[in-house]
Amino acid sequence: ACSRAGENCYKSGRCCDGLYCKAYVVTCYKP
């Protein structure tokens, strides 16, 4: 499973395609 935009990515450690996870924000975002 992957995290979508705005979702927490700290636990999963991965975001859906095209999204990135900022370590200090811990949410997926579009570049």
Swiss-Prot record:
Compartments in which it is found: Secreted
Keyword match Oxidoreductase: no
Tissue specificity statement from the Swiss-Prot or TrEMBL entry: Expressed by the venom gland.
Keywords from the UniProt entry: Disulfide bond, Knottin, Secreted, Toxin
Main location (coarse class): secreted
Single GO term (MF): toxin activity
Bridged cysteine pairs (disulfide): 2-16, 9-21, 15-28
GO CC terms: extracellular region
Function text: Insecticidal toxin that induces reversible paralysis in crickets but not in cockroaches and mice. Molecular target unknown.
Similarity field: Belongs to the neurotoxin 10 (Hwtx-1) family.
Domain free text: The presence of a 'disulfide through disulfide knot' structurally defines this protein as a knottin.
Name by which UniProt lists this protein: U1-theraphotoxin-Cv1a
Organism: Coremiocnemis valida (Singapore tarantula)
Organism classification: Eukaryota, Metazoa, Ecdysozoa, Arthropoda, Chelicerata
